[in-house]
Structures are given as structure tokens and as C-alpha cells.
């Protein structure tokens, strides 16, 4: 079998030729989601089985692990924001430097998250937003919540100095 595969940020192409049967197949797909590319080899095996007169293989179910983990992270960040607000309202304030460190950490994470995603997927943010809209939305929510948590933490640090002085 002769086989070639190629991908761009928004499309995927495969060509394979089955020498023993004389069949050749070109599969052009519009990758609507970067994370779904893992199922394409199974798709190819199914086509080969059909051409050989066999039953196609079952493509494994795509469990959206990334989306589930990101949703759990969003929930945790949302709860963290609520806890920070409650701590501020109840005046249960720790050392100022702890809050500044925590706030800075949240802000640094929010600033670096999208560039890290762009670097790790080797795709521009616009492409991620178009072809992985669910991941882009979840990342945007995470960045927003990281910013909110960072700003709340720094606000608590600035107000804690005033509370400790009075």
C-alpha cells in the first residue's frame, strides 16, 4: 500500500493506493476540530475494509476529554472567585504578599494561556476560534476567570493593608 498524509491548520488530506486491488482513495476532510484528527486513521481502515469487501471497523467514540477537563477547571475557577469574594467580605485576610503572589500568578496564567495554546497546536488563534470554537470559548472563559481571580486577589491585598492599619 502506498500512503501519504498531510495536514494544514484547517484541512487534512490522505491518499492511499491498494496495489493488490488496484484501488486508490483520496480522502479530503475539512477539519472542523483539531482534536478529532486522531480518528482519521480508523476512518482510513474502514474504507480499506469496505474496498476489500469486509465489514468496516468501528470508529472509537470520541470522548471530549479536553472539553471535560476545561469545564472542570472553569467550575473550579468560578468557585475560587466566589471564595475570594466571601473571604474579602468576611475580612478573613491573610498576609498581603500571599494575595499579591496569588493575584500575580492568576494574571500571568491568564496572559500566557492563549499564546501557549497557539504554540502547542501550531495554529493561529483565529483558526482555533473557527475550527475549534468550543475549545476557543472554553479557553476564553478560563482566561476571563483567571483575570477576575487575579484582580480580586490583588484588590484584597491592597485593601488588606488598609484593614490592617485601621
Explain the meaning of each model-derived region.
Residues 1-166:
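Catalytic loop of the DD-peptidase/beta-lactamase superfamily, centered on the K-T-G motif
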